[in-house]
Amino acid sequence: MPDRLNATQRAGPGSPPPDRDRPAPMNRPIQDRPRLNPAGVLCGYLLGVFLGGALLAPWLWSLAQALVPGSGLAQQPFRRYVDRSLLGLALLGLWPMARAGWFPGWRRVGFSWGPCSARELVLGLSGGVASLAAVAALALGLGARSWLPHPPAGLFMTHLVRAIGAAVAVSFLEELLFRGMVFGSLRRRYSFAVSATLSSGLFAMIHFFRRPDPPASVGPWTGFEMLGRMLGGWADVRSLFPGILTLGMIGGLLAWCRERTGSLWLPFGLHAGWIFWFKSYQFLTVATARGDRGARWWGSIRLHDGWATFVVLALTALVFVRALGKPKAGDDRLTDG
């Protein structure tokens, strides 16, 4: 009888299988499950890094005093232990972030090598070096800085190796974290403006750690005290400008490059070029009395805290925004599920 026909017979040939033949909801592929809120994952990650780093630093300091007393490691200022604890936990925290979907693979995160990668890398390196070289040229030409007289050749080669190493290592880690994982994961749920603002704000924040004096003694909770003093630069609003604007603009430009090219090679190149020239600026030049008087314009040895750097990098950002134009057609690597 018709009511006794099974589901396949009622459906007829070529029809989709009945519901009982489909996997149960709990067995559906993982991509069909609701994703964790990236903003919540980011807050949890930051909380774990800062709280864990503050708790870990005193133990590492005590361990160094017990195992290698009087060594260079044991004599490092306590803030260095806090710095390294934060960095170590930030790197270790990348694994659970990857498990939460923040590292969908080297291609999706932006570090796969493609036909345009070499051109983007060279363009970024050229733009990064040229922009800060322009700041240095202005400072030297107007008497705010002077060349360091006759650095020894061996010392110069040491600087070159260290500057290149720092440029590659720091740029790779920061671009992977801030533009690859943080911005990329936020971008898959939120608009470019929201994603770039959050990732750039975090990027700027970590560059405003103070270097406070060592504590009188180190105890289990000294890490929290030191961390509070390191973050105290945010309480002095006047000292934030123009550095916070410059770093925020840098973060926004790097996010824009990630958005427009679909990869991290252009932002990596820019970042590496800036770090290399920043290290070279510190090594090859010294401040003059005129530069000290115009510190608000020329900035300190950190370079990004002067208005001259802000103006030059703002012009650099305009050039790159105009040159990149519209996003690649069909590029959905940042917004697809």
Predicted regions located by residue number:
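Membrane-interface helix/loop boundary segments of multi-pass membrane proteins
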Residues: 173-205, 209-222, 259-263
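Transmembrane alpha-helix boundary and packing residues in multipass membrane permease domains
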Residues: 95, 136, 180, 184, ...
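Hydrophobic alpha-helical transmembrane segments
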Residues: 174, 242-251
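Active-site-proximal inter-transmembrane loops
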Residues: 155-163, 221-240
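Alpha-helical transmembrane segments in multipass membrane proteins, preferentially the mid-helix core
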Residues: 248-260
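Hydrophobic alpha-helical segments and helix pairs
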Residues: 142-177
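N-terminal, membrane-interfacial amphipathic/helix-forming hydrophobic leader that caps
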Residues: 2-10, 15-119, 123, 129, ...
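Residue-level signature of the transmembrane alpha-helical core
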Residues: 125, 129, 164, 168, ...
